[in-house]
Amino acid sequence: MTELGKYAGTVLAAYGASLVLLIGIVVQTVLANARARRELQEHERRG
């Protein structure tokens, strides 16, 4: 394995935190899109 050096833990934690935040943003976007689509369909159905 590659030697990551003295700050390996910090760097890996930063990458992990970034990945978690990115996944959270993607999930929130997908859920908001689904909610908006449902609301639009309901609005169009009512006229």
Curated annotation (Swiss-Prot):
Query: Is the Lyase keyword given for this protein?
Result: no
What processes in GO biological process is this protein linked to?
cytochrome complex assembly; heme transport
Keywords from the UniProt entry: Cell inner membrane, Cell membrane, Cytochrome c-type biogenesis, Membrane, Transmembrane, Transmembrane helix, Transport
Q: Which InterPro entries match?
A: Haem_export_protD_CcmD (IPR007078)
Question: Where would you say this protein principally sits, based on its record?
Answer: membrane
- Please indicate which superkingdom the organism of origin belongs to: Bacteria
The compartments listed are:
Cell inner membrane
GO CC terms in record: plasma membrane
User: According to Swiss-Prot or TrEMBL, what is its membrane topology?
Assistant: Single-pass membrane protein
Query: What parts of the sequence cross the membrane?
Result: 7-27
Pfam families of this UniProt entry?
CcmD
- State the family named in the UniProt similarity comment for this chain: Belongs to the CcmD/CycX/HelD family.
- State the function annotated in the UniProt record: Required for the export of heme to the periplasm for the biogenesis of c-type cytochromes.
What is the name attached to this protein's record?
Heme exporter protein D
Q: Which organism is it from?
A: Paracoccus denitrificans (strain Pd 1222)
Q: What is the taxonomic lineage of the source species? A: Bacteria, Pseudomonadati, Pseudomonadota, Alphaproteobacteria, Rhodobacterales
This protein's gene is called: ccmD
